[in-house]
Amino acid sequence: LIGDNINEKRLKEIGEEGVLAMICDSTNVFSAGRSGSELDVRKNMLNVMSRLKKRIIITSFASNVARMETAFYCAEQTGRQISLVGRSMHRIYKAARQCGYLKNTIEPIDPREAKNFSREKIVYLCTGSQGEPMGAMMRISSYVHPDVFIEKGDAVIFSSKIIPGNEKKLYKLHNQLVKDGIEVISEETEFVHVSGHPNREDLKEMYQWVKPRCVIPVHGEHRHMIEHLSLIHI
């Protein structure tokens, strides 16, 4: 949905020309099969948002422009305005627009203006999906955000994966929202997130195409990178 499809033909040509070393992501090396599609997330997100009749808050990684576009698309399809909350969300949106993305989406409205819309006509896309203390989601859930408030019957969609180490504070946040009568939707309950990192089969196929003489595993804990090296020898 964002950017061009992978150029398999060119990667295979590069592999035939000879590659000394390849640096590759280890994050999802323990995940079987292939990583999913953002298009599938978009379809399910639309189904989820269509059934929700109150205020919706979506929290995700600001850097995930494809997910941002999904939020804009689903807001428009469900007859809602969308408002961005959080400095990094605004910064990434501006950068994406400057690079030619998000051109065919509705214009976001200011959170202060969003307060004038009825609950079923607005969706907020905010930062803080990992429970960051100063993230917009934490401030909203603590009822200290100056422009965005949440109340019983509303819904929060955590459209992101829990980064290892953040489990305790995120589940605490989930529990607090549920206690306040707010519906919590996450990848545990609905298909609202797909990883942008390659799974095991994706990694295997890439190495078959590129055929590097050396592999440098990165982006993961030590156990991920050791497993990545083991995968190469399977």
Language-model features and meaning:
Residues 1-116, 135-147, 168-170:
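His/Asp/Glu-rich metal-coordinating catalytic cores
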Residues 19, 54, 203-220:
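Proline-aspartate-enriched helix->loop->beta-strand connector
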Residues 25, 59, 83-86, 125-127, ...:
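Generic beta-strand/beta-sheet core signal
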Residues 27-29, 63-64, 89-90, 129-132, ...:
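Short, glycine-/Ser/Thr-/acidic-enriched flexible segments
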Residues 33-34, 59-61, 192-196, 217-218:
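Glycine- and other small-residue-rich loops at beta-strand/loop junctions that grip anionic moieties
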Residues 148-150, 161-181:
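Redox- and metal-dependent alpha/beta enzyme cores, enriched for Fe-S-associated oxidoreductases
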Residues 181-196, 202-203:
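Generic long, charged, amphipathic alpha-helical segments
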Residues 232-234:
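Conserved small/polar residues in nucleotide/adenosyl-binding loops
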